[in-house]
Amino acid sequence: MNERSLRILEFNKIKEKIKKYARTNAAKAKVEDLEPYDNLYEINNKLEETNEALEILISKGNPPLEGLADIHEGIERAKKGGTLSPGQLLKVGGMLKATRNMKEFFKREEVEKSYPKLEDLAYILAPVKALEDEIERAIVSEDEISDKASQTLCNIRRSLKEKNSSVREKISSIVRSNSKYLQDDLYTMRGDRYVLPVKSEYKSQVPGLVHDQSSTGATFFIEPMSLVNLNNEIRELFLKEKAEIERILSDLSLKVKINGDSCLSNLKVLVEFDFIFAKGRYASALNAIKPIVREDGAFSIFSGRHPLIENDKVVPSDIYLGEEFQTLMITGPNTGGKTVTIKTVGLLHIMGLSGLLIPARDNSSIAFFKEIFADIGDEQSIEQSLSTFSSHMTNIVNIMKHVDDKSLALFDELGAGTDPAEGAALAVSILETLRNRGAKLIATTHYSELKAYALKTDGVENASVEFDIETLRPTYRLLIGVPGKSNAFEISKRLGLVEGVIKRAKEYMSEENLQFENLIRELQEKSIIAKKEAREAKMLRDQAEDLKKKYEEKLEKLENTREKAYMDARREAKEIIANAKDEADDILKAMRELEKLGIAGGGRQRLEEERKKLKDSLEEREKGIHKMKENEGESITNVTLGMEAYLPSLNQKVIIVSMPDNRGEVQVEAGIMKVNVKLKDLRKTQVTKEEKVRRKREVKLNLSNVESRVDLRGLDAEEACYKADKYLDDAYMANLGEVTIVHGKGTGVLRKAINDMLKRHPHVKSYRLGAYGEGGDGVTMVELKG
């Protein structure tokens, strides 16, 4: 597709809007590179992907892409043997978490709707759970490693806490005993060592090592000799901690290196998902639909809206071309919306051919054009004025060099900017040349000569943008089949021009011209009504055919389901009878064995009686098996819509969807079929003991699976508060005493939002920022009520 048309039709503005819905820079770059695809298969494939994304957003909500970030730098560093920073490891962990969550997101039950395009993409994802868990366990934030990263690190930090506590106790004692020599009754730190702020005149009174001096020279910072060994031990522990952290980071970096290719493959798929769902979110914002893409060069856009005009201001239009006519001539006054109309056609085609859904009504179609050419103004926005004749003509000459039968050409004010007679003649000649090449054309003009050309030329149709004479404003509604009028006399009259001047002006126009205008208007208005009714009739007929086909399919499924249910019931009955007959045969066989062993004649007669009685019983059982099923269970007396019941005749559970009628019948839903049955034939459903136990077990399992921390990094404030609120409810129900909310340090906006939420939360007893080793300012520790 030529760059000039993409620019003139403002496709770049569409891409800027889509970028706002993408999470990653990589997905935004894909949006920036978006342009019409050059083959029909790829167009339909991309449209289906975007449509599936829209349906998922409506039915399941946003996909779990939180925490997704670019990890290329970290992976490259790991592959070269380098050690990744905690921040780089966090990004890898976030990507792996998004991988696993997306994989889970696309798992579905058989009864759920399938999304084959996106499910195939999700199938490629390969979670690395072990590495994800290790990173999550080890890394708290971009500048802190968790105590849980290793037992060695945990022991070192425990020792550090103990040593620091001992030093603080000792130095507090020294402060008290030497307070008269100190500037303040406080100790401070220089480097990693505890020191006292000693007045310069008393520095000899406090034996120790001088570490620093104030800028005025009035204070010396002295480490008391009694603390030197303790400070040395603390220093050694800090060095051990640093070495252990380096080892942990190095070990994790090596594992990232081993899984580097898998990580990059997952990232590529996740970025593609980010790109697709950005298009889906934009489609949702536009209330857009998936268009049909036609190969024959024809299109029908119903209630098409320009996507860059605000919803409350845009006027939908029906625009069609390619079946009854190949060229559309839109006439009427300036500022009437003609330019908006042709820009809408061009932009909606570019969007659809780029795999984007379009703001229009269902069943709208676009054509598969190889090229779309546009001569609209001086590459200006919709609101700006037209360019000069020479600028127009330079562009038109270039267009005419490249147009063929796979092209759509859009001309705004064709032939304008020069003598009207010459301009109209040029316009007709240009249109005829391009029509002979088989191109589809839409042109706007206010020349009467072009209205007449459209009226008498096969394959060319007039159209206009409606104008309200009362308000002197265009309605922007496109009327295909109705030529536009300049409305100069009517507008002048409404603006106060005296009647005599208007009457004299009409006299200067030939009677033929006046009659011509009125006759055209009258004929075309009748024509538009007839064509509109014909199109609506065709649409209704097509819809009726679709409905008929759908209901025939449903009826077939219903019959198949009913037949299957009947066959299942018969098979079950036959199995019961067969088992009973086998049991009877075993009994009779045993009787014969006893008879052989010498049972008396009277006994034999009794055996025969029992045998006959058993046979009669089996026959009765076979006849009445259906009756037995019906008599099982408790009858239903009180009916509520949506209640579950058991239908013995189908041997399955059903849902009651109507109240009893005067015949005592209710409608029930059994799978995909609905049937009317007598209320007396239904039975209450019984929840088995096993089901009750299973349900209780599921509740207990759900509560026992609540973790003691929740990670909100990567979410915005609203999403984070929602997730934290739900997590606190679950944690409270699971009787967790204290939990950790991880929000990261960042700008502090997320932390403040969480704190505001915690102040009002009914389950929260108290909360505080994390201490050293817990996550510091990057986490909030929450104590829950008992």
Swiss-Prot record:
ATP binds at G332, P333, N334, T335, G336, G337, K338, T339. The keyword rRNA-binding applies. Coiled coil: none annotated. Keywords: ATP-binding, DNA-binding, Endonuclease, Hydrolase, Nuclease, Nucleotide-binding, RNA-binding, rRNA-binding. SMART domains: MUTSac (SM00534), MUTSd (SM00533), SMR (SM00463). Residues 710-785 form the Smr domain. GO terms for molecular function: ATP binding; ATP hydrolysis activity; ATP-dependent DNA damage sensor activity; endonuclease activity; mismatched DNA binding; ribosomal large subunit binding; rRNA binding. One of its GO terms (biological process) is negative regulation of DNA recombination. Pfam families: MSSS (PF20297), MutS_V (PF00488), Smr (PF01713). Endonuclease that is involved in the suppression of homologous recombination and thus may have a key role in the control of bacterial genetic diversity. Acts as a ribosome collision sensor, splitting the ribosome into its 2 subunits. Detects stalled/collided 70S ribosomes which it binds and splits by an ATP-hydrolysis driven conformational change. Acts upstream of the ribosome quality control system (RQC), a ribosome-associated complex that mediates the extraction of incompletely synthesized nascent chains from stalled ribosomes and their subsequent degradation. Probably generates substrates for RQC. Belongs to the DNA mismatch repair MutS family. MutS2 subfamily. This is Endonuclease MutS2.
